[in-house]
Amino acid sequence: MTQGANNGHLNGLALPHVRILPLSYDSEDSQQSATRLILTVRPDWASDDSNIEFIRFTDGITNTLLKAINKRKGWSKEDIDREAILLRAYGNGTAVLIDREREAQNHELLMKYGLAPELLARFQNGMIYRFIKGSVTSPEDLRKPAIYRAVASRLAQWHATVPCITHPTSANSHVDENGANGDQDPDAIIENAAPGKPVPNLWTVMQKWILALPINTQVQRERQEKLQRELEYIVKEFSQRPGLGADGLVFAHCDLLSGNVIVLPSSLPAKGSKKEATVTFIDYEYATPSPAAFDIANHFAEWGGFDCDYNVLPTKSQRREFIEEYVRSYFRCSQGNTGVDIEAETRKLNDEVDLFRGVPGFYWGIWALIQAVISEIDFDYASYAETRLSEYWAWKEEKEGDRAAAGKEMPLRERRWEQME
């Protein structure tokens, strides 16, 4: 697939860093600790006419997200929203899953390209950034043509214009050595997950997570060994495939669920209107150099929400429309569409997304197995892990022909993927 001219890699990117506050958020003392953080960033909010309130968002299943508003006397709702700030505190133990230094670097890079809100400060267990006025989408919204075309266009802009940040030692951060085998160095295992690819990347992230899986029981050890074998299979099948971006990797969001898609004000078209919506993306903690086809397949999986409702996943025609919009936007951003066969590029990317459709289930299945151990959030991660991993097994059975050979019925998710309309 043709590579985007503007999409390359940046080694050791130098960006102006935001200040780091020597404070933390305490969930047991939410109001006071959050207020202290906000006043450090906005000392003017301590004025007599200020009235600070916090609104808790409950859509996420990893972090605590608070919207801080100041109902200052004389301010309109417009004024209040314009000055609003978001405070995001990291979930318990999530450093094993997420490189927080890299997350901040992602945010700063996206700011440089006008694709992220201003990052105001970091603190010991989170960050503070400006609120983006708009409407958070629901899984149902993602299935609306005006929205999914807007998502396709914005995602293509990310992939075509934002360079990947790569570092020779970036995979080394905060590795829990639960899964290290014998005398092997876990850092070396991670960095060599996909030989020849700059690190970090989708493959090194999954390798890091597999090494972090609990291995306290025989069942856990056997599961880790099984998942390790599957990762090696996936890497062999996918890591060297040609694709968009330098080395077949783009700056990918990797977590484009409905809660991370914001429809900007006054951009949602009325029913019957041909006007297109405009969206932006938030939360960049999982953003990692990855194949574009993975990022798209991962987003398609989110049409079903956390409930994994396979009945509403995009049909062939919906995927085709999304991918064609993506391709047009990608090459418009990277090459001005000069000499590009849009139809041919759409077919190629559509085929790649089809191939990648099982990988998001593997990715989030491993993630959920770790969350089941470390998270304090009220969510059934263990069941979610089994659901997502079953998506991968179903895809592999279909790919290898095992399901048909055994005379088994095609699973619902695979049937939906085959559905035309």
Regions found by a protein language model. Give the residues of each.
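Intrinsically disordered, low-complexity cytosolic loops and termini enriched
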Residues: 1-21, 171-195, 269-270, 337-342, ...
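ATP/Mg2+ or Mg2+-diphosphate-binding catalytic cores
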Residues: 338-347, 360-421
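Active-site activation/catalytic loop segments of kinase-like enzymes and analogous catalytic loops
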Residues: 293-338, 358-376
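ATP-binding pocket architecture of kinase catalytic cores
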Residues: 55-233, 237-250, 269-277
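Catalytic-loop of the protein kinase fold
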Residues: 248-254, 258, 264
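Juxta-kinase regulatory segment immediately upstream of eukaryotic protein kinase catalytic domains
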Residues: 1-56, 220-227
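Catalytic activation segment of kinase domains across protein kinase-like and atypical kinase folds
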Residues: 259-306
